[in-house]
Amino acid sequence: MTFDIKIVLDIAISMFLVMLVGYFLRKFGIIDAKVSKSLSKLVLYVTQPVLIVISMIKMTCTAETTKQLGIILLVSLGVHVFAAIFGYISMKVMKEQNARKLSEHSIIFANVMFFGLPIVQSLFGDRGVAWASFFSVIFHIFAWTYGMLVLGRGRDDIKLSLKKVLLNFGTIPCLIGIVLYFVSGLNIPQELLSGLAGVKKALDYLGGLCTPISLLVLGGVLTTLPLKKLFNNWRIYYVCLMKLVVFPLIVYLVAKFVLNIGDEMSMFTMIMAGLPTASLTNMFAELYDIEPGYAATSVGMTTVFSVATLPFIVWVAQLF
């Protein structure tokens, strides 16, 4: 599968411009911290789950589609396990424990939903959203298991939570979407389906809010970061290089030439692997007081640089 680099670049630039609007809205107080938090909750609790569910409903229930979704789950598991190994080895250069474990966490956990959904929706359509949603199931399980183990090194107060592993705003809408996906494969009377058209349209409207709101919030978050420190820490540049360039390209080569899962799914997997660090890293750092400034800087810098690195790695991948 060949992607027009101009299309990928246009997507990245358009996302950056919306983030820039969010940056200035927060900078000038039009969106303050309270509003930003409310918008984040709106995305997390409403628009993102609705987008996940509606993307699953739009997929036609076939044996091939079901097989693809199963493959995505296995691929996501493989990517996260490999990211854990890659992060552990590549971050050994950092001697300070907090910086090292936060950097590992940054490598492993990508901003699949807030940043990834707009990209894969533009490149792959509703199918891409469904793929990303399934990919995020493993993300959430991994975040509340291995992610806790990484952050818990040298700490006695950071524990695993089985409840949060199973019940969160990533896995629950996926489960609902899976049920509706299989129900759609049944012979449902056309009269009933036409009667639900208005409901489906309302869900489309709500799901459509996810991308612009999440990008505005992301842009606003950048105003809270120490800009001078953003550009004066070699560790952050190293994390960006490993996270946004080296790791996703290795993932692509393995997916395409070792796993042989096809060009389209290999490209999708690489994009997922090359997304910026999830805001979850900063959230946990704040919660457990693990150098939150460093975590915020990591999230901010990978987000900014990814606007350039995503088109770059797509271009490089198409050379193979």
Q: Where on the chain are the PLM-derived regions?
A:
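Alpha-helical transmembrane segments of multi-pass small-molecule/ion transporters
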Residues: 1-320
